Every structure is written in structure tokens, then in C-alpha cells.
């Protein structure tokens, strides 16, 4: 770890490499990234080629990158292996999680391997790691341990579970690699390893990819025939595993079927426990199944192959039979506590924003005000999100653009004026009392009209409560 940091294998420098062709699906960017790395001829380039990009290097290059003694030890423990002409590369994939390092399997080479840290996992860590220190946290389905390692900085005790024994072994190794000692690794399916325990925080990215008939199941990938069977099973047992006011952040790409509202599907999965839960669905990118099938069929292989077209077609036929046309990537935020409520918010694609736990804190607190009732809303202090801008785009219409994670929206000029007044007032009640007489209707009617406008602004994220 010290050597990797010495040669600048960190988020900033590795990010400059992964930005190359970053909008292209894996593995299309690989040739261009390697082209740039091979031109560097320095320790950083050699290390990334051997440890991150499966591009064998010579003994001299390995020694320059890592030092001869360390290379010998890595070969001895199997983190570097000999390839053609005796060149060296890792059979694993080295990734980054925060300031730490994470070894995972090359999923194209290892049968039912262990997933590491990709774009969605990094987004899940940013959203799921709490803003305050907590006593206990659970990484459910830990894979190589990325989320557990991130949680270990904010939790006194972390439990990490997985149904795959190889995942537990690799995650335990990664924790030791990063000098982390407060993670308890347990083998088992979903909540079985934690029995009757409850946690302050639960974070999970369960497998949610659909599995067509007659295809080989992969533990890290498939969530069932439709893809959401495993996530729904997880949600059905979730709330009792949370402490009072505990929060779960569960990432799922939900197949959209028969125009069934996502709020209803999540509520049905939670069952009777939904009456004791606050549910906030953060809807990120929506993907058409044509793109989904193409990306996954191609991404499971290092390069185009004769099986690519047949695999993509098999997946597409499967979705057609189920009536699925789109998939919705969603961060499902569930808190245990009253009053119970459900809400959903459109957010930017995870690759275009960094949705953090602090954003979720604000959104949950604000929606909680609506559920708490009229008096709570009137007595609250609401503010426009930091960095939001208001631009008149048409007669009577104003476009609101957010600096963080929410999608832009349009509101009326009257609504924008109301928002500005609430933003400047000590409380919502003060703003309404000042505005109501100017609305040209009886005073009580004006108060209700203004309060309804505040509710709408809160619903769309134009006004937020400070948690």
C-alpha cells in the first residue's frame, strides 16, 4: 500500500486514465487506456498495466514499479503471476475505494467471481456512508468489501456478509491490506448471518440483473428471472434489521413492468413493515432494454466474440417475454421510524453527479416535514439549495437548475417569487403571513394557497429543510 501511494496510484491520478473514453461501455475503452499507459514508461504506468489492466510487464518494469523484493513477495502469494515470455500481471483487478485499495476478480476470467468497485459501487459508498459516526453498520452482499471498507471509517463495528465463500475471503484480505480491524465477516444468504441483530446503517447493492432461461447463474450478477426477485426478498426482511431511526441505502435497477409505480412495488416488497418506515426513492438513470442487453452482453467479454450477438439476443427475447422495456436505477432509502411516508425524487445519473449522504439527509428531513403536518411545516426554516440558479425561460416560466444532484425543473414566476420569500424568512409562517395579503383573495384562502405552493416547492426539492 505504501509503495502504491508513493508512485501516485490514487484517485486523482488513476482518474486521469479512467476518464479516457469514459462514456463508452466496458471493455471498449481498454485499448486507448493501455495506449496511453504504455507510452509513460514510468512506475505509475507499469503498476497500472500489471495490477489494473491485465497487461503483462517485464521483470525490470515490475521492479521499477514496485521494487524487486515486493515483486517477489507478490509472486509468492499469487497477486502477480507469470504469463507468456515470463512477463508479470495480476490475476486479480486492483481498484480504489476512497483512499484504500481493493483486489477483486477479473469477472471475465473467473467462474462466478467476486465483484470489486465500479461506478455504481462508488456511488453507493458516497450515498450510504453516514455523515455522522454510528455504532453499527451492515454491508449486505459485500463482494470484495468496498462498501464495508468505506463504512469502517464511520462505524464502530461493521458486519459484512456474502453468500459466496470466495467473496468473504477476498474481502477479509482487502480489509487487512488496508489495515482495517473493525469489520466482522460472515458467510450466509442475505440476513441469515446476522440473526436477530439490528443496525444503524445497512448498505447493499444486491445482484439485480435478469437471468434468461438456460443461462449459467452467476452469484455476483443475477437477481432472478426478472432481476428484482432477490432485491424484493431483501426488502421484505429489511425493516426489522434496522434500529429505530436507522437507515438503509439499497441500490437496485428495477425492471419497469405494466406501468406499475415504483413506490407501490417497493411498498409491496416491504409489506406490513412499510407502516413503520420512511421511504425515499432516488431515481437515477433510466435505461432502455436494447441498450441494457447490448452493454451486458458485450461487457461480459474482453472483446467482441461470436457469442456476443446471440447473448444480446437471448437477453432481449427474455425481456420481451416479460414485457420489460426500460429499467430504472434507483437508490432506495428506507428509514425505520414514524411518521411513515413514501416519496420519490428524480436525480442526475450517478456518473454525472456525486450523490452524498448529506444530500439524502436534507431530502429526508424536508420530506419528513410534509409528513409531520401543517404546524411542523409552518414552524420550519426552509432554504433554496446551495448553488441553485433561477432563469426565466418563457413568459411566466422559470427554470431551476441545481448545483448538486437534482434534475432541473421549471416552475411558474409566482412560485419562484414564493420560494424567494420563504428563503429569506425566519419561518414558513412568517413568509406566508407576509405574502397572503398580496394574493388578491381572502386572507385565509391566501394563506392556504401560499402553503400549498410551499408544499410543491418542497416536493420538487426547490426548498430544503436543514436537518
Cite the ranges covered by each PLM segment.
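Acidic, low-complexity/disordered tracts enriched in E/D and polar residues
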Residues: 1-46, 86, 110, 339-420, ...
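Long, charge-rich, low-complexity alpha-helical segments
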Residues: 43-91, 125, 129, 138, ...
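Class I SAM-dependent transferase core
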Residues: 82-131
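Conserved SAM/SAH cofactor-binding pocket of Class I
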Residues: 118-204, 210, 255
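Conserved Class I SAM-dependent methyltransferase catalytic core
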Residues: 164, 227-283
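Mobile active-site "lid"/loop adjacent to the S-adenosyl-L-methionine
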Residues: 165-166, 204-233
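Flexible, glycine-/basic-rich loop-and-beta segments that form/coincide
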Residues: 289-366
Amino acid at each position: 500500500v505504501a509503495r502504491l501511494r508513493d508512485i501516485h496510484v490514487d484517485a486523482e491520478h488513476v482518474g486521469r486514465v479512467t476518464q479516457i473514453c469514459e462514456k463508452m461501455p466496458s471493455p471498449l475503452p481498454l485499448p486507448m487506456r493501455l495506449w496511453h499507459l504504455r507510452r509513460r514508461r514510468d512506475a505509475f504506468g507499469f503498476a497500472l498495466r500489471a495490477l489494473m489492466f491485465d497487461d503483462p510487464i517485464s521483470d525490470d518494469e515490475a521492479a521499477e514499479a514496485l521494487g524487486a523484493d515486493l515483486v517477489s513477495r507478490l509472486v509468492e502469494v499469487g497477486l502477480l503471476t507469470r504469463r507468456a515470455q515470463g512477463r508479470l500481471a495480476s490475476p486479480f483487478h486492483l481498484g480504489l475505494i476512497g483512499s484504500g485499495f481493493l483486489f477483486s476478480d477479473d469477472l471475465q476470467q473467473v467462474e462466478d467471481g467476486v465483484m470489486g468497485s465500479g461506478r455504481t459501487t462508488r456511488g453507493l459508498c458516497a450515498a450510504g456512508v453516514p455523515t455522522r459516526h454510528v455504532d453499527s453498520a451492515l454491508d449486505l452482499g459485500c463482494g470484495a468489501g468496498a462498501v464495508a471498507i468505506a463504512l469502517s471509517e464511520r462505524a464502530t463495528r461493521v458486519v459484512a456478509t456474502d453468500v459466496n465463500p470466495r467473496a468473504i475471503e477476498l474481502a477479509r484480505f482487502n480489509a487487512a491490506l488496508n489495515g482495517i480491524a473493525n469489520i466482522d465477516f460472515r458467510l450466509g444468504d442475505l440476513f441469515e448471518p446476522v440473526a436477530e441483530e439490528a443496525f444503524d446503517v445497512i448498505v447493499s447493492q444486491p445482484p439485480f440483473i435478469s437471468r434468461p432461461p438456460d443461462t449459467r447463474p452467476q452469484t455476483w450478477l443475477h437477481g432472478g428471472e426478472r432481476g428484482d426477485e432477490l432485491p424484493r426478498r431483501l426488502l421484505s426482511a429489511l425493516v426489522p434489521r434496522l434500529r429505530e431511526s436507522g437507515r438503509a441505502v439499497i441500490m437496485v435497477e428495477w425492471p419497469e413492468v405494466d406501468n406499475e409505480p415504483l413506490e407501490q412495488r417497493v411498498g409491496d416488497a416491504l409489506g406490513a413493515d412499510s407502516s413503520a418506515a420512511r421511504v425515499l426513492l432516488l431515481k437515477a438513470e433510466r435505461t432502455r432494454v436494447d441498450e441494457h442487453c447490448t452493454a451486458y452482453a458485450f461487457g461480459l467479454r474482453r472483446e467482441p466474440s461470436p457469442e456476443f450477438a446471440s447473448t444480446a439476443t437471448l437477453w432481449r427475447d427474455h425481456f420481451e417475454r416479460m414485457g420489460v422495456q426500460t429499467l430504472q436505477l434507483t437508490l432506495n432509502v428506507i428509514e425505520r421510524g414514524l411518521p411513515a411516508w413514501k416519496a420519490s425524487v428524480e436525480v442526475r445519473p450517478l456518473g454525472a453527479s456525486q450523490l452524498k449522504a448529506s444530500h439524502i439527509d436534507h431530502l429526508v428531513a424536508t420530506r419528513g416535514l410534509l409528513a409531520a403536518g401543517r404546524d411542523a411545516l409552518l414552524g420550519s426554516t426552509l432554504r433554496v439549495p446551495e448553488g441553485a440558479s433561477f432563469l426565466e425561460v418563457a413568459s411566466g416560466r422559470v427554470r431551476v437548475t441545481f448545483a448538486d444532484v437534482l434534475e432541473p425543473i421549471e416552475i411558474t414566476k409566482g412560485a419562484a417569487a414564493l420560494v424567494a420569500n420563504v428563503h429569506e424568512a425566519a419561518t414558513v409562517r412568517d413568509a406566508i403571513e407576509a405574502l397572503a395579503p398580496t394574493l388578491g383573495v381572502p386572507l385565509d384562502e391566501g394563506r392556504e394557497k401560499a402553503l400549498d405552493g410551499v408544499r410543491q416547492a418542497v416536493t420538487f426539492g426547490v426548498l430544503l429543510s436543514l436537518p
